[in-house]
């Protein structure tokens, strides 16, 4: 293959077809339509196949990005899928929801001169082709004679479960809700991540022999100690996420019509409240909705409210648009669909309509001061700038905290924020119990949670004697990938009992 240069590759990033905003804003069908084969091949021709692979180093799970893209260009889609699934069994999910613009695409060499290679779109394309073709990637597995429990079936739990199953362990995943998937199932709407895609990716895990046990709340039905001492699990991974909603503690939060984005999305996505009364779960959304926050969850909540029939939906955020933590694509989609944005606006009180309902949101205008610990400029109140926004529903999407159930019912040591404390191997204060993902770090991305799950699996294999003890190990955030040094990203030497 002739060496590619910036001048020799297609200069423009291949666009992806999207449904018209006015059409899609009233239904839950997926917004982005994905690449065709010809579009994917054309975009693959923009990759320079850099020898230092900055995109691979920026991926929390170490996907061989040039490898899978090269095979797309050769139209070997099954080979491309096999390369992807060496490191992730969720390509159709990650291609849709990972923030590639601040990870792999953010360091793409092409992006220094042109728009970066659309790595996420290409990953989604291959994942979708695999689902449509019924492909699966099942390695030769030698039974290790060990049982492993995974608590939580979100991204961290699924990644850990997959690696432990590949190592020959009999893996049982315990899920509190009635369906597996964690935040992929209850936290992300169908128009961004269809349930059918989640179902298909989970089916890939079941083909590895992984068992999902739903409607089982560890910490209530069983303790972590019981899993090991009484149920025969040799090791346990806790990846339950951090789903307890955060509020502002301002007057009026107890009024009818105030809800967290977590509850809104869970009712709509998991319990299918949007199909009420055909489904049993109702959800009360008024004509005018104010959503507080500007992250991805806030964007999802606003766009869901539109689809539930709200006539006006507004975003209220105390910083400017430039500081909004939402992905650029999600913010763009929300703007296209008619969301109103009140930047530099901070709620101070929810107004009572006299009947314990909401009639408005009193806010104070802000201006940006000096940078705070996050590196963003701190919002400072502007004296005498209060305004009242008319609304009958207020949705809070300002972050989450750790669910306290596990910490209250076992000997787990927690940190000062209420998250599970772990050492550098992600081991907890209970022997044989490991933890990772949002329940350790606080809210993060899907791919970061998957990276934590893989890193924990590597540590669990060492703990169980299934991996060589001299495998190089790297701390999270270092040059290594999911617990192995960079040079070990393709595989680690493993032995079976």
Name each model feature, range by range.
Residues 36, 207-229, 277-281, 344-392:
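A structured beta-alpha segment of the ubiquitous adenosine-cofactor-binding alpha/beta core
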Residues 68, 92-94, 101-151, 167, ...:
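FAD-binding core/adjacent interface of flavoenzyme oxidoreductases
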Residues 254-286, 371-443:
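FAD-site-proximal beta/loop scaffold in flavoenzymes
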Residues 170-173, 177-212, 302-349, 470-485:
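Rossmann-like dinucleotide-binding cores of NAD(P)H-dependent redox enzymes
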Residues 439-464:
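A conserved FAD-binding loop/helix module that cradles the flavin
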Residues 146-172, 298-306:
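N-terminal Rossmann-like FAD-binding beta1-loop-alpha1 element of flavoenzymes
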Residues 1-35, 336-338, 346-359, 369, ...:
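Mid-to-C-terminal Rossmann-like scaffold of FAD/NAD(P)H-dependent oxidoreductases
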Residues 24-43, 63-96, 113-142, 268, ...:
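Ferredoxin-type iron-sulfur electron-transfer modules in oxidoreductases and energy-metabolism complexes
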């Amino acid at each position: 293959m002739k060496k590619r240069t910036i001048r020799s590759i297609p200069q423009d990033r291949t666009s992806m077809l999207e449904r018209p905003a006015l059409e899609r804003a009233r239904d839950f069908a997926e917004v982005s339509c994905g690449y065709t084969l010809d579009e994917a091949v054309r975009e693959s021709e923009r990759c320079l196949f850099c020898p230092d692979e900055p995109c691979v180093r920026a991926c929390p799970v170490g996907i061989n990005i040039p490898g899978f893209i090269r095979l797309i260009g050769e139209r070997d889609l099954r080979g491309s899928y096999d390369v992807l699934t060496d490191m992730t069994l969720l390509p159709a999910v990650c291609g849709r929801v990972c923030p590639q613009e601040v990870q792999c695409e953010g360091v793409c060499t092409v992006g220094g001169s042109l728009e970066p290679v659309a790595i996420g779109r290409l990953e989604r394309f291959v994942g979708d082709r695999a689902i449509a073709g019924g492909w699966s990637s099942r390695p030769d597995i030698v039974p290790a004679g060990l049982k492993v429990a995974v608590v939580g079936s979100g991204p961290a739990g699924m990644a850990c479960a997959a690696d432990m199953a590949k190592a020959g362990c009999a893996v049982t995943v315990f899920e509190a809700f009635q369906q597996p998937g964690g935040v992929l199932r209850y936290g992300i709407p169908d128009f961004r991540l269809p349930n059918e895609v989640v179902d298909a990716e989970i089916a890939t895990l079941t083909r590895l022999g992984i068992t999902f046990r739903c409607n089982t709340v560890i910490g209530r039905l069983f303790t972590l100690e019981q899993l090991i001492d009484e149920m025969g699990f040799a090791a346990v991974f806790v990846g339950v996420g951090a789903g307890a909603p955060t509020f502002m503690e301002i007057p009026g939060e107890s009024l009818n019509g105030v809800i967290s984005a977590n509850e809104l999305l869970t009712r709509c996505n998991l319990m299918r409240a949007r199909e009420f009364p055909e489904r049993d779960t109702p959800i009360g959304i008024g004509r005018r909705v104010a959503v507080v926050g500007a992250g991805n969850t806030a964007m999802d909540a606003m766009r869901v409210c539109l689809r539930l029939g709200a006539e006006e939906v507004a975003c209220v955020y105390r910083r400017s648009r430039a500081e909004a933590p939402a992905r650029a694509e999600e913010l763009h989609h929300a703007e296209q669909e008619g969301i109103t944005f009140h930047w530099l606006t901070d709620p101070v009180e929810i107004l009572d309509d006299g009947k314990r309902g909401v009639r408005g949101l009193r806010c104070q205008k802000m201006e940006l001061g000096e940078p705070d610990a996050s590196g963003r400029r701190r919002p400072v109140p502007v004296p005498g700038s209060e305004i009242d926004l008319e609304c009958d529903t207020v949705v809070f999407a300002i972050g989450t905290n750790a669910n306290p159930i596990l910490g209250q019912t076992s000997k787990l040591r927690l940190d000062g924020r209420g998250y599970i404390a772990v050492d550098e191997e992600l081991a907890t204060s209970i022997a044989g119990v490991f933890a990772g993902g949002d329940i350790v770090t606080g809210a993060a991305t899907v791919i970061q949670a998957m990276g934590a799950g893989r890193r924990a699996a590597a540590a669990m294999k060492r703990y169980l004697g299934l991996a060589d003890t001299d495998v190089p190990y790297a701390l999270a955030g270092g040059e290594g990938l999911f617990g192995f040094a960079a040079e070990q990203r393709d595989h680690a030497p493993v032995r079976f009992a």
